[in-house]
Amino acid sequence: MGILKLQVFLIVLSVALNHLKATPIESHQVEKRKCNTATCATQRLANFLVHSSNNFGAILSSTNVGSNTYGKRNAVEVLKREPLNYLPL
């Protein structure tokens, strides 16, 4: 009787371990946002042109330029700059 209980326990344990292996672990993944800045638009256009046709000469490799490539503007420096006076008043 003890051997039967051991076999049942091992089967249940095996099923439980297989279930744990098959269950994906939830992780905090950052979702990629659609970028609408000029840099990202330029990258998308370059990638489109590279992949759309090769009739324009040499195949250029796709660019990997994102909105964080050039960094963020420092708001303090922007506020300290003198205003540009294009039109004399």
Curated annotation (Swiss-Prot):
Pfam families: Calc_CGRP_IAPP. Residues 23-31, 74-89 form a propeptide. The keyword Signal applies. InterPro entries: Calcitonin-like (IPR021117), Calcitonin/adrenomedullin (IPR021116), Calcitonin_CS (IPR018360), Calcitonin_peptide-like (IPR001693), IAPP (IPR000443). Residues 1-22 form the signal peptide. GO terms for biological process: amylin receptor 1 signaling pathway; amylin receptor 2 signaling pathway; amylin receptor 3 signaling pathway; amylin receptor signaling pathway; apoptotic process; bone resorption; cell-cell signaling; eating behavior. The modification Tyrosine amide is found at Y70. It is found in: Secreted. Disulfide bonds join C35-C40. Keywords: Amidation, Amyloid, Cleavage on pair of basic residues, Disulfide bond, Hormone, Secreted, Signal. Amyloid fibrils are degraded by insulin-degrading enzyme IDE. GO terms for cellular component: extracellular region; extracellular space; neuronal cell body. GO terms for molecular function: amyloid-beta binding; hormone activity; identical protein binding; lipid binding; receptor ligand activity; signaling receptor binding. Belongs to the calcitonin family. IAPP is the peptide subunit of amyloid found in pancreatic islets of type 2 diabetic patients and in insulinomas. The mature protein is largely unstructured in the absence of a cognate ligand, and has a strong tendency to form fibrillar aggregates. Homodimerization may be the first step of amyloid formation. Can form homodimers. Interacts with IDE and INS. Interaction with INS inhibits homodimerization and fibril formation. Amylin/IAPP is a glucoregulatory peptide hormone that plays an important role in the regulation of energy homeostasis. Selectively inhibits insulin-stimulated glucose utilization and glycogen deposition in muscle, while not affecting adipocyte glucose metabolism. IAPP function is mediated by the CALCR-RAMPs (AMYRs) receptor complexes. Amylin can also bind CALCR receptor in the absence of RAMPs, although it is more selective for AMYRs. This is Islet amyloid polypeptide. It comes from Homo sapiens (Human).
